[in-house]
């Protein structure tokens, strides 16, 4: 087995004494750092390589932490229109997953880069930590590489904001195939709109 295979087997057993100790140390370290920061290297090189990262110019890894739990509805100045102040505010579940939120925040922080993918690196009682793989579309190493230069096209600007990354597609339900999958494409809202629309076709 190669070195990455051994790393992969270590990460499979996250509750082992070794991994729980390493994760406890790393989450402590990540809490001391800024919420979004550039990582000098990947914490999980095997996972990063699987998701498309190459250790060469043009690629970057940013680390981000996201608060765990649900999402409160943002209410301007506490205006709730006669209802109790917390009704319809708390206990709401966000439609997207936290990994998708992490990608979005990193994408807004470094808009000149393109989000390729992301992966989990740790969590504690309050936060989840993710590392996001980004590619620089203006770098020659990316533009001249036929395996990655598709991301340089303008259609892939801010793909993380449009649910086009792996985490975004999962949140949209696009990993489902077969029975009951037809109501998910092209999107839930678009499919619903098409089903509500009365179409009176004229045949000539």
UniProtKB/Swiss-Prot annotation:
Transmembrane segments: none annotated. Disulfide bonds: none annotated. SMART domains: Ribosomal_L15e. GO terms for cellular component: cytosolic large ribosomal subunit. Keywords: Ribonucleoprotein, Ribosomal protein. The keyword Ribonucleoprotein applies. One of its GO terms (molecular function) is RNA binding. InterPro entries: Rbsml_eL15_core_dom_sf (IPR024794), Ribosomal_eL15 (IPR000439), Ribosomal_uL23/eL15/eS24_sf (IPR012678). It comes from the Eukaryota. Gene3D superfamilies: Ribosomal protein l15e. One of its GO terms (biological process) is cytoplasmic translation. Belongs to the eukaryotic ribosomal protein eL15 family. PANTHER family: LARGE RIBOSOMAL SUBUNIT PROTEIN EL15, RIBOSOMAL PROTEIN L15. NCBIfam families: PRK04243.1. This is Large ribosomal subunit protein eL15. The lineage of its organism: Eukaryota, Sar, Alveolata, Ciliophora, Intramacronucleata. The gene is RPL15.
